[in-house]
Amino acid sequence: MVKISPLNLKLLRDVGQMKGQMFAVGIVMACGLAMMIMARSLIFSLESTRDAYYERNRFADVFSNLKRAPNSLRARLAEIPGVAAAETRVVGSITLDLPGLAEPADGTILSLPEDRPQQLNLLFLRRGRMPEAGSHNEVVAGEAFALAHGFEPGNTIAATIHGARQTLKIVGIALSPEYVFEARAGETLPDNRRFGVFWMNERELATAFDLDGAFNNVLLDVAPGGDRAGVVLELDRAGQEVWKVPLQGRPFHAVRY
């Protein structure tokens, strides 16, 4: 039989006299532990959902902006060691004339390939359809902007693209892994009434920005286990002096402008 020291006996008596307080402390500790487990489970669930969404819609690993590069460079990009898929596109800014706004809104417009399947940053179409090949002024609008203005497929928007005023017809509303929330570069909070994201057929958008036969944006998907830094270096070599800004990989998953 283990002998209990007088101090331990006193401790047990004191604990016995404070049953209510000890029970309350135990409840607080149990609640804290439960909250920690719930928070960790929620974080794990959100991360798993995010990763599955990015993988399902083939979110690119490397993005690069250019002034101009010929479409013939596309094949060279796909041959870079460690690259699983390469996508080139035209990206630009537009000004929007919207009713109810005292000042013009603005947006980003991105091209959709017509002569080949889209490989990266796939759109998830919520309503409507994609622009038809050879169509004129048909666009897909980001869902956040469409909801802020009550736009539906079939509505039109007055826009200025590279100095030319056009009437854009919304044929679809979509989500994109590239725009977890739709905001201007550098903004921490979205302003969905004054900024929107749109997608248009590549040939028409390239013509609007005087980029016929060329592109100004690159997306790369790095193969599993690939060296992202090495891919960026090879991309820089492939483009040589045509790149506009230093290349940047995807530093985090939370937001991509």
Feature annotation, model-predicted:
Residues 1-257:
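Membrane transport/envelope proteins' first extracytoplasmic loop
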